[in-house]
């Protein structure tokens, strides 16, 4: 009897364009402790929104990974995009490489996860383009080594996060419109987390308490906000400006972006039209799932 031949897996076309890397908002962010290795223990809820960088990938057969777009201040060798691609190569032993271009829209140092989201989109897109078929949990493990915010973008859903941000539970959040204000000030994450005045003992909450909250957008607080607004005056000014329209406005991540939820797009656009000209702002809509969630 002739043995049946096993066909090699069929690869997708060599080019994958217009891959979104969405921003995230931290609806609250509690610092609950600090590990011996220096990482902070957190509780937060991640909300994905439709403000995105866009990445483009072309498969190579020689194993070379290149970033074809220049990003001022970010050398290709240290870029999370390139590091993510190489981490995926190392984890799988694939012979493939990639040319990667990016339309960089999300501000760096904004607290909206731009670099982490770019890394996650790279992992998801190349998992597909290289025909690897890795499960989501494995991509999340690879992503965690790149940064604590990478796993939630690979996870692909809005999530209640614990640990250093990698212990994720999906949460249902209402369809929402937000105004995000970027006061054009770069806030270094390490500077905020290392500040001696940072509170690191916020009591633990449980997901059921958040789920039962009638207004999930006023739950808790951002423990990093007081530090960032004391150090960076434009962040403080932007937050106070936005609180004119929604008293529950708050900072996302370690800043510099601040945000508030509004009843509908019309109201959000009305607020955005009053934005002081020295700042950038966006009207964005919530996402229920990551646009590339099907790639894992």
UniProtKB/Swiss-Prot annotation:
Binding residues annotated for ATP, in chain numbering? 107-117
On the tree of life, the source organism's domain of life is Bacteria
Instruction: Tell whether Nucleotide-binding is among the UniProt keywords.
Output: yes
What biological process terms from GO does the record include? Answer: isopentenyl diphosphate biosynthetic process, methylerythritol 4-phosphate pathway; terpenoid biosynthetic process
**What keywords are annotated for this sequence in UniProt?**
ATP-binding, Isoprene biosynthesis, Kinase, Nucleotide-binding, Transferase
Q: Which GO terms describe its molecular function?
A: 4-(cytidine 5'-diphospho)-2-C-methyl-D-erythritol kinase activity; ATP binding
Which InterPro entries does the UniProt entry name for this protein?
GHMP_kinase_C_dom (IPR013750), GHMP_kinase_C_sf (IPR036554), GHMP_kinase_N_dom (IPR006204), IspE (IPR004424), Ribosomal_Su5_D2-typ_SF (IPR020568), Ribsml_uS5_D2-typ_fold_subgr (IPR014721)
Instruction: Spell out the reaction equation it catalyses.
Output: 4-CDP-2-C-methyl-D-erythritol + ATP = 4-CDP-2-C-methyl-D-erythritol 2-phosphate + ADP + H(+)
Q: State the top-level EC class.
A: transferase
Q: What is this protein called?
A: 4-diphosphocytidyl-2-C-methyl-D-erythritol kinase
Q: Which organism is it from?
A: Cupriavidus pinatubonensis (strain JMP 134 / LMG 1197) (Cupriavidus necator (strain JMP 134))
